[in-house]
Amino acid sequence: MLFPVCLLSVPSVRAQTKEPASTSAEELHGGIEIGAKGIKSVAVRIVGDERGYSVNILNADILNTTIVQTKNGKFTPEAIRDTGSVTQRFYQRLRQDYRIPPEQIHIVGSSGLIGDNSQDLAEEVRKRTGQEMTFLDVETEAQLRIAGSIPRRYRIGATWYDNRGVAVLIDIGSGDTKGGYQLLRRVAGGAPEYDYITWGIPKGTVTFTNEISKAAGETADYQTFAKRAQALSPESVRAILRNEVARKPGLINRKRIYLSGGIVWTMMTLIRPEDRSTFTPVTADDITNFYNRAITNPEALLNPDLSRIRNKALRQEAEREVESVRNTFTPKNLIAGAEILRAVAGEMRLAGKQIYYARYGYLAWILSYVRLQAEK
């Protein structure tokens, strides 16, 4: 079982600085996450003190790749080569710009990587970096995401309350959908501990897009694609979600919901671009609104009117993020992801609950992983 960790909120991944030469090399750590839709790289400084550990993010980079592309169940040679090249570039930057020792850089593959030839990808990474690549299973990745995405406490007035005992994480990725919660366990003669209850289904925004395209045809128009998504969802998405809920009642009994993942980021960027808070409130109506717009006119949804944002700096930041969305997801990805999001909202009964978008949840598990390695 993984030990709970508490990560600091990321103020801005654009605030990137090189670490001064006086920093001890033992404090510098790096992580490279290879996921279904892209690669993330983080450089962090981890310092131990009497309260535990503090984490300072020095740099965070993200670049989309084609690794999710498969042929006959295998990653294509082009996808492997592309991913290896980006990984090498990120690795060299961690070594040269941030002077992180090679033994303190960890290259990790997401559970959303679905291909029968993962060893070919690992060999490409090893050839380009000299580093071994670790692959996570769904349960371990979900544990890391929970620890990194859900704040340990919340406050009402002047009183603090335990948050992880009443909250659940839902992460809709490109390759799968997963999450979970922590369950308090009393220990005789000692302090209470948390167990992780995790869940996951092999359906994500891109994998479901591929499934719909196979059924509807690669050249299907958006209306046909949306109808096929609606037809596939009951058995392909909702049925397996319902099975997870039946086995893990905490998924519907908890009242505080934290959402993360690419399609959630896309939704919040497109329907509420001016809100930059770390934990942004979301409603079930927001999800319904996003879904209806995605299935009726996804291209219009990808081009929101940002002129209403009066603050120039905020508007420019929103413009950059909207452009990132357009570079990451196609209109058909929007339709598929919105269908999964609607299924999650229905099967997990999100209406009436306190829902939050964890803005920096996309960095959660790689930061948690790096920190756990540093604590060994």
Regions found by a protein language model. Name each.
Residues 70-98, 115-117, 121-165, 188-191, ...:
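Helical "lid/coupling" subdomains associated with nucleotide-phosphate turnover
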Residues 25-132:
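Conserved phosphate-binding loops in N-terminal lobes of ATP-dependent enzymes
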Residues 1-9:
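Bacterial N-terminal signal peptides
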Residues 13-17:
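Boundary at the C-terminal end of the N-terminal hydrophobic targeting segment
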